[in-house]
Amino acid sequence: MKCIALFLVLSMVVLMAEPGEAFIHHIIGGLFHVGKSIHDLIRGKNRDMAEQQELERAFDRERAFA
């Protein structure tokens, strides 16, 4: 009997929650972020960015010695 009452109370809490307060929105947003990160890793976007930064550092070092 306690389990049934607990189930009904929790069901009402979930149904009465505002859509903006939903935890599912955060989960879905996190999944999209993870998917984009994996996609960027596969395509090598971060690798190109790191390579560009390394070239800029080398250029700055050469300019400092000149």
Swiss-Prot record:
Pro-peptide region(s): 44-66
Subcellular localization: Secreted
UniProt KW Signal keyword: yes
Keywords: Amidation, Antibiotic, Antimicrobial, Fungicide, Immunity, Innate immunity, Secreted, Signal
Tissue: Expressed in gill, skin, intestine, spleen, anterior kidney, and blood cells.
Subcellular location, principal: secreted
Arginine amide: residues bearing it: R43
Annotated signal sequence range: 1-22
A GO BP annotation: killing of cells of another organism
GO cellular-component term (any): extracellular region
UniProt PTM: This peptide exists in N-terminally amidated and non-amidated forms. The amidated form is more active and has a greater alpha-helix content than the non-amidated form.
Pfam families referenced in this protein's UniProt entry, alphabetically: Antimicrobial12
Purpose of the protein: The amidated peptide is bactericidal on human pathogens like S.aureus or E.coli, as well as on the fish pathogen A.salmonicida. May also be active against a variety of fungi. It can kill bacteria in less than 30 minutes (S.aureus) and 120 minutes (V.vulnificus). It induces hemolysis of erythrocytes from human and fishes (sea bass and lesser-spotted dogfish).
Family the UniProt entry places it in: Belongs to the pleurocidin family.
Protein name listed in UniProt: Pteroicidin-alpha
Organism in which the protein naturally occurs: Pterois volitans
